[in-house]
A protein has these predicted regions:
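Short loop/turn motifs that connect adjacent beta-strands in outer-membrane beta-barrel proteins
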Residues: 23-28, 71-82, 94, 107-111, ...
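Internal, well-ordered domain-core segments that constitute the primary functional module
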Residues: 121-234
Length: 495
């Protein structure tokens, strides 16, 4: 892990010294949006809620009004600045006023420093059609953070520029303290003042101008740390996690906690860490583009490498981009498996009589101290593992993380002003190893969406969506959604 961190630092230095920043025009853009959902059932259909950057609601009747502004400008040949503010007021959401985005970015050549809350998309996947990333997707609200990043691939000097790198390091804070206090039922735990950390390093090998196949691969890791755990109904915290400088280092380079942390942190790693290895190969075949990808999720060291043999859990995908036609633009198929989790047994020699360690029963997305890998009730990872927002028992956990699922998404543009999108998902759920469901639950989720952007009304778009859930996990739900959006440029030109 230390070698990965040193390599990332060297890469950032290379990106600063070897590349120049493109001169961007001064631009100020605005967006005003209104959306409403109406449905029948226990919840709003999943695909009317999932992968919408957390600006959504599981309630059958809900709506929002949103307004945002973004400004971009160059400071000189190498420096650039951008900032944005995106606010919403909502009905039947987890909060009635939402600061969706509030950020300021300072870029130097290809290096970017981002401060604040900003919407981001999963790595290597089609955010419009994919079911989402395993570690972080676009399912939950953005987490405010300080982020040092190379957001786009940077070519490393060499013949034909075959090697490209990108990556980031970030620290932030979760913002759902009040929601957790309100949602958690008496006697159940919740944790507030929780801090956030993430990092990634990705490489791309190839140059499609010289060879029609490119390969991508990388690692991303995120963590929850710090914070105070409470039991609902009690005033004093039961666990107070330290947040000293050394603790920030312990999540940067994952290490065990000291005697100021609970025993679980001393035996394992300080904080709740999640991560994944990501691989993709993209072929450019005349006017076709075909990508295959694989994301291997790990919740601890047992699945980070090959300690317990071959990887059995993962997220595989196929994405096909078609030559321009009226019927279909892009097709995505994905298969998801999280059922193994290294096996059903966990044994820590710290508390036992035997020296052997069995690091299984990984319990994806759940944690004894931070409850779940979630923000405002929505899972930060893949939404096919439903988040705590769906729990009736007032617990901030994932009730089913052992899942096998298939997912299909496709979209098209029959004409210049009309486009469509369709999502179809089928999943089977076993619950968790500790709390298995009394039977295998099956769930089907679907979405059909049409967007009309009339040429005579520049900047306006109207999106109508219909969705349906059928099954015995989330139930049978039906609903429709209407979104009206106006986008435009307030100012544009050279500095």
């Amino acid at each position: 892990m230390k070698k990965i961190q040193l390599f990332l630092l060297q890469f950032l230095l290379i990106s600063i010294t070897q590349h120049t920043n493109a001169q961007l025009p001064v631009k100020t853009e605005y967006t005003v949006e209104m959306g409403g959902t109406s449905g029948k059932g226990t919840y709003a259909p999943m695909w009317l809620t999932a992968n919408r950057q957390g600006l959504s609601s599981a309630n059958t009747e809900n709506g929002y009004l949103r307004a945002g502004i973004a400004h971009t400008m160059p400071l000189n040949q190498h420096f650039g600045f951008s900032a944005g503010l995106d606010l919403a007021t909502a009905y039947n959401f987890t909060s009635s006023f939402i600061i969706q985005q509030a950020y300021a970015d300072l870029s130097y050549r290809w290096l970017n420093l981002s401060i604040g809350s900003k919407e981001r998309l999963p790595e290597l996947k089609n955010s419009k059609l994919s079911s989402g990333g395993m570690v972080e997707s676009n399912n939950a609200r953005p987490i405010p953070q300080i982020r040092l990043e190379v957001p786009d691939y940077v070519a490393i000097p060499g013949p034909h520029k075959w090697l490209h790198l990108k990556g980031h390091i970030a620290y932030g804070r979760f913002t759902d303290d009040k929601w957790q206090e309100h949602f958690t039922s008496i006697g159940n735990p919740y944790t507030i003042d929780v801090l956030y950390h993430s990092k990634s390093l990705f490489a791309k090998v190839g140059n499609k101008e010289h060879f029609p196949v490119e390969f991508e691969g990388g690692i991303q890791m995120s963590a929850q740390f710090g914070g105070d755990q409470y039991i609902a109904g009690q005033k004093e915290p039961v666990i107070d996690m330290p947040t000293r400088f050394v603790d920030f280092m312990r999540v940067l380079v994952p290490m065990a906690g000291d005697d100021t942390t609970p025993e679980g942190e001393q035996v394992n790693i300080y904080g709740n860490h999640v991560g994944s290895w990501n691989f993709a190969a993209t072929a450019y075949l005349n006017r076709w583009k075909v990508k295959i990808y694989y994301e291997h999720y790990f919740d601890d060291h047992s699945q980070m490498f090959f300690q317990y043999g071959r990887w059995k859990d993962g997220h595989i995908g196929l994405e096909i981009t078609f030559p321009k036609n009226r019927f279909i633009d892009t097709f995505v198929y994905e298969g998801l498996g999280t059922k193994d989790q290294t096996g059903p047994m966990l044994y820590d020699s710290f508390w036992g009589k035997f020296e052997e360690q069995i690091s299984a029963k990984d319990n994806y997305y759940n944690h004894y101290l931070y409850q779940g890998w979630q923000h405002w009730g929505m899972g930060i990872g893949n939404p096919l593992l439903p988040g705590p927002i769906y729990n009736k028992n007032g617990q901030i956990t994932f009730i089913s993380n052992r899942v096998l699922a298939h997912h299909i998404g496709f979209c098209g543009s029959p004409c210049q002003s009309l486009s469509y999108r369709m999502l179809l998902s089928y999943s089977r759920h076993w619950g968790t190893y500790d709390n298995p469901l009394n039977e295998i639950k099956k769930q089907f989720n679907s979405l059909f969406e049409v967007t009309y952007a009339p040429q005579q009304l520049k900047g306006w778009s109207f999106t109508v969506s219909g969705a349906m859930d059928r099954g015995n996990l989330l139930g049978n739900n039906y609903g429709g959604m209407l979104v009206i959006r106006k986008q435009g440029i307030i100012k544009s030109g050279n500095k």
